[in-house]
């Protein structure tokens, strides 16, 4: 490669450190994969995810009270079932209800919708 470029975000972090690019189908595949792995007791990744849940730390946020290893791990948006969530820029959300085998992927760049209303309504 003749030229190398490193992109930095507005807070000074390298671009590769805080962004993950994927299509909505990629996100859905990630959700399915995570849901299957978290339920597999013999899976190394499943053990990693269960460890993220059991060792998550308090966030002080109503919509995601605990966080561990890139996942909000306890009752995201007040869901009653065992669920984890990834959240990104513009309220990009991946909610994985691994107790009831449900996945909600919201591929958004606009933060003006109301996930606190939408998510419990869809995932109930």
Ranges and model annotations:
Residues 1-22:
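Active-site helix/loop module of the DD-peptidase/beta-lactamase fold
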Residues 2-8, 50-106, 111:
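Active-site Gly/Thr loop motif
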Residues 18-40, 92-109:
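Active-site-proximal alpha-helical segments within enzyme catalytic domains
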Residues 23-27, 45-48, 118:
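Stable alpha-helical elements in mature extracytoplasmic
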Residues 32, 40-57:
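A conserved catalytic-loop motif detector
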Residues 114-124:
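Short, gly/Ser/Thr-rich active-site loops of penicillin-recognizing serine hydrolases
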């Amino acid at each position: 490669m003749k030229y190398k470029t490193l992109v930095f975000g507005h807070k000074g972090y390298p671009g590769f450190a805080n962004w993950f690019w994927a299509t909505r189908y990629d996100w859905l595949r990630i959700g399915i994969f995570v849901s299957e792995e978290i339920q597999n007791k013999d899976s190394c990744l499943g053990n990693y995810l269960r460890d993220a849940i059991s060792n998550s730390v308090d966030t002080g946020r109503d919509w995601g009270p605990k966080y561990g290893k890139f996942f909000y791990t306890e009752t995201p948006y007040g869901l009653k079932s065992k669920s984890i969530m990834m959240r990104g820029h513009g309220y990009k959300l991946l909610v994985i209800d691994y107790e009831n085998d449900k996945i909600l992927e919201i591929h958004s760049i606009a933060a003006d919708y109301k996930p606190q209303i939408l998510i419990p309504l869809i995932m109930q």
